[in-house]
C-alpha cells in the first residue's frame, strides 16, 4: 500500500501556522552504507561528519572541484552508515557525482524511495507527536529513533519536526492527526525553510554557488579544520582571503507572480532598477505575502528595495534568525 500525498494549499507563515502535517515530496532521501561509508562521505562534504553523533543532524554541502555546490545535504547517521535529505530535483545529478570515486571504496550509495518523508509543524506540534511516538527529539538530542521512524528536530523559524518513516507509520500518523491537523504539500516546509534561512538548492542553481554564498558557514555546515574534501581549496580561500562577496537573503513583500528558482531580481537605484542576485526559492503565503530566498551581494543596505523583474510591487529585506558575523 503506497502513501498518498496531500493536496496543495497556500502555506502559512510560522507565526500563524496551525498544526500541519506536510508531505515532503519535493525532498528525497539517500543512503551510504558499508565499512568505508564515514571515510568516503567525509571526503566529499563540507561538514565534519566524523564529529557528528547519532543524536545530531548536520547541513553540509557537496561541492565540485571549484567549490561550487551540487547540493546541500541534511545528514544524519544510520545503523550502518549515513542518510541525507536533499531537494528531489538535484538528487540524480548529485548521486552521480558522489558515486564517481566509489569504485575504490567499500560503500553502497543509493536513493531510498521506500521510506516516506513527512514534516510536522505549527501549533502544538510537539504535543501532537507525543501522542504517537514514545520519544521526541529536542535541542539536546536532535535525532531520535522510534521503531521504524527517525525524527529530526528543527529550531527555526519555530519548533518543527521531520520524520523519516515507513509507509505504514506514515499512513497511521495521517489517520491519527487528520482530525486536528491541516494537511499540506512541500511548499509549506519550503516556506518554513525560507523563513529559517536554510538554503534550497534546486536544479536551476546546482553548480552555481560556493557554500558561503548561501550562509552555510553560519548554519554550522562548513568545517575549516577537517581534512581534504572535494572543493575544499576554494571554500577555504573564500574564508581566509575574503573572496566571498555574496550572502543568502530573505525578502518579503508583494508580486503579481511567484518567480522561479534561477531568476534574478531588480534593486531600486534612485529612479531606476538594476538587475541583481539569483533566486533560490520563492513561495506565496495564504495572506498574499511573497517570500523570496535569494543570493545577492553581502553588503546590501538593510533598507534596500527590490522587486520581481518588471513587477509593480516591491520586496524588502527581513532579518534571518542567525548572524553572519564571524
Swiss-Prot record:
GO annotation terms (biological process): iron-sulfur cluster assembly; RNA modification; tRNA processing
Keyword Ribonucleoprotein carried by entry: no
Task of the protein: Folate-binding protein involved in regulating the level of ATP-DnaA and in the modification of some tRNAs. It is probably a key factor in regulatory networks that act via tRNA modification, such as initiation of chromosomal replication.
Protein location: Cytoplasm
Alphabetized GO MF terms: folic acid binding
Origin: domain of life: Bacteria
Entries under HAMAP family matching the protein: tRNA_modifying_YgfZ (MF_01175)
Species lineage: Bacteria, Pseudomonadati, Pseudomonadota, Gammaproteobacteria, Enterobacterales
Protein name: tRNA-modifying protein YgfZ
Cross-referenced InterPro entries: GcvT/YgfZ_C, tRNA-modifying_YgfZ, YgfZ/GcvT, YgfZ/GcvT_CS, YgfZ_barrel
Species of provenance: Salmonella paratyphi C (strain RKS4594)
Keywords per UniProt: Cytoplasm, Folate-binding, tRNA processing
Amino acid at each position: 500500500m503506497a502513501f498518498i500525498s496531500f493536496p496543495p494549499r497556500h502555506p502559512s507563515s510560522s507565526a500563524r501556522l496551525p498544526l500541519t502535517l506536510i508531505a515532503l515530496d519535493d525532498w528525497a532521501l539517500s543512503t551510504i552504507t558499508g565499512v568505508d561509508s564515514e571515510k568516503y562521505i567525509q571526503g566529499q562534504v563540507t561538514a565534519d561528519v566524523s564529529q557528528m553523533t547519532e543524536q545530531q543532524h548536520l547541513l553540509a554541502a557537496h561541492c565540485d572541484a571549484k567549490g561550487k555546490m551540487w547540493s546541500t545535504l541534511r545528514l544524519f547517521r544510520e545503523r550502518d552508515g549515513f542518510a541525507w535529505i536533499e531537494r528531489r530535483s538535484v538528487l540524480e545529478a548529485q548521486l552521480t557525482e558522489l558515486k564517481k570515486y566509489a569504485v575504490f571504496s567499500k560503500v553502497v550509495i543509493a536513493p531510498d524511495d521506500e521510506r516516506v518523508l513527512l514534516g510536522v509543524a505549527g501549533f502544538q506540534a510537539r504535543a501532537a507527536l507525543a501522542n504517537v511516538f514514545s520519544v521526541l527529539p529536542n535541542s539536546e538530542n536532535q535525532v531520535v529513533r522510534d521503531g521504524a521512524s527517525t525524527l529530526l528536530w528543527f529550531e527555526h523559524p519555530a519548533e518543527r519536526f521531520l520524520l523519516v518513516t515507513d509507509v505504514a507509520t506514515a499512513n497511521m500518523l495521517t489517520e491519527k492527526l487528520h482530525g486536528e491537523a491541516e494537511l499540506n504539500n512541500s511548499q509549506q516546509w519550503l516556506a518554513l525553510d525560507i523563513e529559517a534561512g536554510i538554503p534550497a538548492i534546486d536544479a536551476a542553481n546546482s553548480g552555481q554557488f560556493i557554500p558561503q554564498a548561501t550562509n552555510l558557514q553560519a548554519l554550522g555546515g562548513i568545517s575549516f579544520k577537517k581534512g581534504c574534501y572535494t572543493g575544499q581549496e576554494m571554500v577555504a580561500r573564500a574564508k581566509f582571503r575574503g573572496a566571498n562577496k555574496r550572502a543568502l537573503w530573505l525578502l518579503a513583500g508583494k508580486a503579481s507572480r511567484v518567480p522561479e528558482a534561477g531568476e534574478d531580481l531588480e534593486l531600486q537605484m534612485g529612479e531606476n532598477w538594476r538587475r541583481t542576485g539569483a533566486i533560490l526559492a520563492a513561495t506565496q503565503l495564504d495572506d498574499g505575502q511573497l517570500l523570496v530566498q535569494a543570493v545577492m551581494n553581502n553588503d546590501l543596505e538593510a533598507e534596500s528595495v527590490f522587486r520581481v523583474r518588471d513587477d509593480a510591487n516591491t520586496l524588502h529585506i527581513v532579518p534571518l534568525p542567525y548572524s553572519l558575523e564571524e
